[in-house]
Amino acid sequence: MSRSYYRTRIKFCGMTRAGDVRLAGELGVDAVGFIFARESSRRVAPAEARAMRQAIAPMVDVVALFRNNSKEEVREVLRTVRPTLLQFHGEEDESFCRSFNMPYLKAIAMGGREEVNARTLQLRYPSAAGFLFDSHAPGGGGGTGVAFDWGRIPTGLHRPFLLAGGLNPENVYDAVLATLPWGVDVSSGIELEPGIKDGYRMRTFVEEVRRADCTVLE
């Protein structure tokens, strides 16, 4: 590539402890995610997320993740947590996603067999700030810890995209080189158990992403 500088953004998702949030900031992570999807084992209450928000470093985005939540549930999180970005993982349509007047990412299920078309995505969600490609099947949730075939990511996207699904310190270097994403999103790959992050794996994940960034420029 002709760039003199290349930097993949990093999002740590499924945060449940203030100490993990604080370490994410120290490691230079760009965003932390709180999950409000009802069926998630990493779900936190809005009041819990608000308390953890105090540990977030300046210039780190706060992402609120939803999956088929009601509008009132989303609004409660907006009032209580004050996220900077929303992320929708369910069957939410464009009208629902844009109704909160907030930038949002739309998660795209890559666990099925149906081909994903860039033009179709951009027509379906024209106001999306970007897309997140995850390994869950249509109708399922994220955080599976299983990767999908990165070659299935559609070409021709005119919006930034994040790569998710089964990423960990062992494979994120290859993932970045294979897909050149705007960002990577990890949850289970840096955990001891759901919601409990491992400091060593968090640090190693960041180091591997930065190593990949340097390799892109070679």
UniProtKB/Swiss-Prot annotation:
The keyword Amino-acid biosynthesis applies. It catalyses: N-(5-phospho-beta-D-ribosyl)anthranilate = 1-(2-carboxyphenylamino)-1-deoxy-D-ribulose 5-phosphate. Keywords: Amino-acid biosynthesis, Aromatic amino acid biosynthesis, Isomerase, Tryptophan biosynthesis. Its EC number is 5.3.1.24. GO terms for molecular function: phosphoribosylanthranilate isomerase activity. It is an enzyme of class 5 (isomerase). Signal peptide: none annotated. One of its GO terms (biological process) is L-tryptophan biosynthetic process. Pathway: Amino-acid biosynthesis; L-tryptophan biosynthesis; L-tryptophan from chorismate: step 3/5. Pfam families: PRAI. InterPro entries: Aldolase_TIM, PRAI_dom, RibuloseP-bd_barrel, TrpF_fam. It comes from the Bacteria. Belongs to the TrpF family. NCBIfam families: PRK01222.1-2, PRK01222.1-4. This is N-(5'-phosphoribosyl)anthranilate isomerase. The lineage of its organism: Bacteria, Pseudomonadati, Pseudomonadota, Gammaproteobacteria, Lysobacterales.
